[in-house]
UniProtKB/Swiss-Prot annotation:
GO biological process, one term: aerobic respiration
Gene Ontology molecular function, alphabetical: NADH dehydrogenase activity; oxidoreductase activity, acting on NAD(P)H, quinone or similar compound as acceptor; quinone binding
Function: NDH-1 shuttles electrons from NADH, via FMN and iron-sulfur (Fe-S) centers, to quinones in the respiratory chain. The immediate electron acceptor for the enzyme in this species is believed to be ubiquinone. Couples the redox reaction to proton translocation (for every two electrons transferred, four hydrogen ions are translocated across the cytoplasmic membrane), and thus conserves the redox energy in a proton gradient. This subunit may bind ubiquinone.
Stored PROSITE patterns: COMPLEX1_ND1_1
Subunit structure: NDH-1 is composed of 14 different subunits. Subunits NuoA, H, J, K, L, M, N constitute the membrane sector of the complex.
Name this polypeptide is given: NADH-quinone oxidoreductase subunit H
Source organism phylogeny: Bacteria, Pseudomonadati, Campylobacterota, Epsilonproteobacteria, Campylobacterales
Reactions mediated catalytically: a quinone + NADH + 5 H(+)(in) = a quinol + NAD(+) + 4 H(+)(out)
Main location: membrane
Keywords assigned: Cell inner membrane, Cell membrane, Membrane, NAD, Quinone, Translocase, Transmembrane, Transmembrane helix, Ubiquinone
Amino acid sequence: MSDFAFFALEALIKCIIIIAIFASLAGLATYAERKVLAYFQRRIGPDMVGPFGLIQLVADMIKLFTKEDIIPSNSQKFIFAIAPLISAICAFVSLAAIPMLPEFTLFGKVIQPIVADINVALLFVIGTSGLCFYAVFLGGLASNNKWSILGAARGLVAIISYESVGALALIAIVMLVGSFSLVDINNYQSDGFFSWLIFKQPLAFVLFIIALFIETNRTPLCLTENDAEIVAGYGTEYSGLRWGMFFIGEYASMIAGAILVTLLFLGGFNSFWIIPGWIMMIVKSSFIFFWYFWARAAFPQLRPDQVMKMCYLILIPLAVLNLLITALAVLL
């Protein structure tokens, strides 16, 4: 087999594996979230269908995907129909440039668990994942429903504001490492526990986590939907499979965000003592992913004015200050 044919086959297999695994994980995450929230609220959660309620996930999927697909008569039908697909596609495309595990050898060929190892991977991931909000805005606007439009507009304002916070935090990382490649950033943290960037950039870590909650539509910083204010927000008119596509895209973005935090701040997939790198990657990413559930259970929903004031009066000034301090540290 020629090198090009092997490369093409390898890339195709990687794409199929990523879609299959992360679509499954997105569904499994719903079960995990229900169990975690039940524990916080002193409930049991799903426990009737299958062992530990695991088959409840299958029952919910059957129910969701067999529901009638309703398109409102006064909506922009084409945009309304494709917006959920854009959301899911952008979430999965962003995973293409994220290295998941250490490289390994298969049939004499070195395999890197990444579809595209590009030198601007960080820019690619942030750009493609940010497009998920473009789908949210299109879906809300095309619904021609006041709650959907309000949710879409609130989400758009939030993502424009908090992208600045996340970008400034990441620029500090790039200044230290000297590269936009996620593989290079991972390798920068290969000298042991105290080489992790969370110790060199603790403020950037906090700022990026906050921006991540906005980008993934998670409580307490979710502005696109609120039962007490705008019903289901951008998703008010969606049902069945189309609502499920938004749902899969959101959870895939959450998983990608957890992996990205691990790569940027927590040592990535480097080995720790006698623990292999791939185990460390799974453990650390799962720990970050758990934060989504913990925050939803522990914190109240913030008002839009509180979210925006926090961004412009606190977070952006802190991000700029962190950037200036990092620049001085690099120069000196």
